Amino acid sequence: MGTSFFLGNYWLFFSVYLLVFLVGLPLNVMALVVFVGKLRRRPVAVDLLLLNLTISDLLLLLFLPFRMVEAACGMRWLLPFIFCPLSGFLFFTTIYLTSLFLTAVSIERFLSVAYPLWYKTRPRLAQAGLVSVVCWFLASAHCSVVYITEYWGNATYSQGTNGTCYLEFREDQLAILLPVRLEMAVVLFMVPLCITSYCYSRLVWILSRGASRRRRKRIMGLLAATLLIFFVCFGPYNMSHVVGYVSRESPSWRSYVLLLSTLNSCIDPLVFYFSSSKFQADFHQLLGRLLRTCVPWTQQVSLELKVKNGEEPSKECPS
């Protein structure tokens, strides 16, 4: 998190943050409503994992306006300074929370298909809860090292000299941070990527031998969305860890690839959507209710289409 983070076009940062906020927030709020409803009716392990992923995305999105204000002010931090390390900590923690939870989902999906009898005999919900706690701990513990280094090593926030939010590390502090970043890239990105790739490749192979076309399409959509997050959103950022370790300094393009990592909050809902046909049905139902509430004329159009197609109109009262 050196000064290279904020070099470049400030309005590019603002535009990307704003786009992610406007697209990601409503989608993740809707996903939260759907998952809470599903867990109340019939708790399933994969839904608990995806609920945690949704909460992680919402934490990032709720603190994203702080970054938007910062970018709009030319990367000057004019807000209470306590929000600087807090927003930064959540910003980086959610990156690795996503990779860990996506990996947990891939394992859950693979086990349910490859070993269905064994899978049904296991207390999956309790295990999913334990896995969720471990994921939160691993991501938080790794990302907290940056801030421990800051206070322990008397690093100075650059706010003290130029009003920005980013840390300026000395050479001895970089000697600690750069290996930690490399370890994060290996343990929290590369290993999860390998596990996820293995699970989904085996899953696709198993389903190709007898599953319905609809189920295969859903799994392929889930695979595509997951790999898009790993390779496009998180791959370049974690590559900067490797480059930084080799060159002994943060690369100048690190700030731009970090922007890509925020896009996962918009792509994660695709993972939710392809996670199950039940989620798709609940999502469509919730979206229909919102449209009827916000745009009343859509209900009349729906009734007219049903009458035109010879269908029986619903007897429900307008919501």
Swiss-Prot record:
Glycans are attached at N154, N162. GO terms for molecular function: G protein-coupled receptor activity; lipid binding. It is found in: Cell membrane. Disruption phenotype: Knockout mice display a retarded growth of sympathetic innervation and the superior cervical ganglion is significantly smaller. A heart rate decrease is also observed together with altered secretion of cardiac noradrenaline that might be due to reduced sympathetic nerve activity. Contrary to wild-type mice, oxygen consumption is not modified by feeding or starvation. They also display impaired SCFA-triggered glucagon-like peptide 1/GLP-1 secretion and impaired glucose tolerance. Finally, knockout mice display altered protective intestinal inflammatory and immune responses. Belongs to the G-protein coupled receptor 1 family. Keywords: Cell membrane, Disulfide bond, G-protein coupled receptor, Glycoprotein, Immunity, Inflammatory response, Lipid-binding, Membrane, Receptor, Transducer, Transmembrane, Transmembrane helix. Its main location: membrane. The chain crosses the membrane at residues 16-36, 44-64, 99-119, 128-148, 184-206, 219-239, 255-275. One of its GO terms (biological process) is inflammatory response. The keyword Chaperone does not apply. Expressed in white adipose tissue and skeletal muscle (at protein level). Abundantly expressed in sympathetic ganglia such as the superior cervical ganglion. Also expressed by intestinal endocrine cells. This is Free fatty acid receptor 3. It comes from the Eukaryota. Disulfide bonds join C84-C165. The keyword Transferase does not apply. The lineage of its organism: Eukaryota, Metazoa, Chordata, Craniata, Vertebrata. It comes from Mus musculus (Mouse). Residues 1-15, 65-98, 149-183, 240-254 are extracellular.
